[in-house]
From Swiss-Prot:
Keywords: Membrane, Transmembrane, Transmembrane helix. The lineage of its organism: Eukaryota, Viridiplantae, Streptophyta, Embryophyta, Tracheophyta. Residues 385-408 are annotated as: Disordered. This is Putative UPF0496 protein 2. Its main location: membrane. It comes from Oryza sativa subsp. japonica. Pfam families: DUF677.
Amino acid sequence: MIERSNSTPSATPARPPLAVDEEYNQAFRSKSFLDLWSHAHHHLTHTFSSFKLSTSTPCAGRGGAREDDFLHAGGDGGAADDSEQSCSYTVLDDFVLEPSPESLARGARLQQRRRRRPRRHRVETLLIEYFDVTEEACEACSALLAAIGAARRHHLTLRRLLLRLDGGDDDDAKDALARHVRLDNPLSPGSLSEFHDVHARCSPLASRLAAAQRRLRRLARALRIARGTAAAALVGACAAAIVAAVVLAAHALVGIGVAAAAFGATPAGAARWWGRRAAEKVSSRHYARAGATLDAAARGAYIVGRDLDTVSRMVRRAHDELEHGRDVARIAMRGHGERPLLQEVAREEEECEEDLRAQLAELEEHVCLCLITINRTRRLVAHEMARGLPPPSPATVTTTSEERLTSS
């Protein structure tokens, strides 16, 4: 301690720079993320032809086949590398939504059988909407992954056409480039309408779930206060009856029987009877369990909504970067084959390709992380729902077993 206090600030060793990228990778790439990422890249070993067949998009059918034939006719040595890069997009065939819609439907049927009057409450309606929205969010993320792959192929085709245009093949390259630029941007809002729709539904759903959870909390508190007040009033009434019986017993022997009957109806027994009757109608525990389920659903909808916010901003950035490359290609088309202009366009496209590749890779990672978040929140809500369910009766179990045997 003395040596440290006597040392001058100049003698203090310099602190090593903070490795932000390393810390980010350690925090971001958890085990669950790496598992899903390995599933996502399961199809990287497939050939480029089979990949195109499995991930064909509507915009590829409007002249895209002719352009691909034109591009691959060049026979350049970088075709294998480009096809490997274009395969970086993968479809999550191994991803399983948990809990599955079939299990949710089966649980809803079991819950309806336990009721005397099968009707849907507001809590159940909100929970069903939550599971529907998260399922649609999963489908939207899958569609976004397809759009990421289409964006990679779109920009790769753009680069190759510009290289052919720079190489002197003006007529064919210019016609193919004109057709390609007229295609829609794969990351445009019109192409990702499903993603933007489900993104817009998350925030209102989280607000409604939180409002319903607060309402159940107020109902549970009011029920506890009402039960306590009713119990106190019942105890007071029983005490008044006992006092009246004692007064009557002092004036007549008949009062002894009345007093005995009053003592038999003790406040504790009356309170227990009233508690059983109230519990048959509604229980504060029911409100507490339903409130816990709604709280988990509200948290899940909020988290999924924030993840979709991040993904939406990243999609906007990647869309602008890809659109910048398309604008540069339009400038090259209007340049009448001028050599300096084509060289400047090639340099600009090379820089755009590096930025776009990094943005699409980061976007793909965040989409996979969003899928993990969707599964985790759905499992938490299903766990809270299972905690509040009573054990199934033997008749229900027998009926369910018969249904499974019939379906199998």
